[in-house]
């Protein structure tokens, strides 16, 4: 299967529950010592429709040990999302480890290297549902000590540090809102 399914689909076991819907158990990836949230997340997917590639994002905080600020990035495109804020990241390529994809995407988008912390998960799973039927894995991270500061590239209009208490006032992409709320909750425990 191609079109974003590839290796991703080959690793899934389908369990048909109706003639038109499968419940697919997406395997947890090996994240080289990173804490995962759950072993599987169940996602309804129409039969014959390839699963889209997963997406990864970083909730970049000023400090993993004592977070007070988050790097919020406003989208440059597409036009309907322009100016709305998101957590930076991107697609996992075929056969790519999600943690490696996250490091690659942040280097491409923001020119920074990260120290990756704990995964931020939805209740009962490890992948967040987002736009276009995709799913997203999110990790807390901080800028690595040997890295330059993140800066907005072609994908973003701006990248700015925002106090955790002020994040709700930003115009977030709708799919990122529950994720940002979970990030704030995990940072303020």
What residue spans do the PLM features occupy?
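Conserved N-terminal beta-strand and adjoining loop/helix that marks the start
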Residues: 40-71, 91, 122
């Amino acid at each position: 299967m191609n079109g974003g399914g590839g290796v991703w689909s080959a690793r899934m076991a389908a369990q048909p529950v109706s003639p038109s819907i499968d419940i697919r158990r997406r395997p947890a990836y090996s994240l080289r010592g990173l804490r995962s949230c759950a072993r599987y997340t169940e996602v309804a997917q129409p039969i014959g429709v390839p699963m889209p590639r997963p997406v990864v994002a970083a909730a970049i905080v000023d400090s993993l040990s004592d977070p007070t600020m988050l790097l919020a990035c406003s989208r440059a495109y597409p036009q309907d999302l322009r100016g709305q804020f998101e957590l930076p990241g991107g697609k996992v390529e075929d056969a790519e480890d999600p943690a490696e994809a996250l490091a690659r995407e942040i280097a491409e988008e923001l020119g920074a290297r990260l120290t990756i912390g704990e995964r931020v998960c939805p209740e009962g799973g490890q992948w967040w549902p987002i736009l276009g039927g995709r799913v997203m894995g999110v990790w807390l991270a901080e800028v690595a000590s040997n890295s330059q500061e993140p800066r907005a590239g072609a994908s973003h209009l701006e990248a700015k540090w925002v106090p955790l208490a002020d994040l709700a006032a930003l115009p977030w992409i709708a799919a990122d809102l529950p994720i940002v709320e979970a990030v704030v909750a995990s940072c303020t425990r």
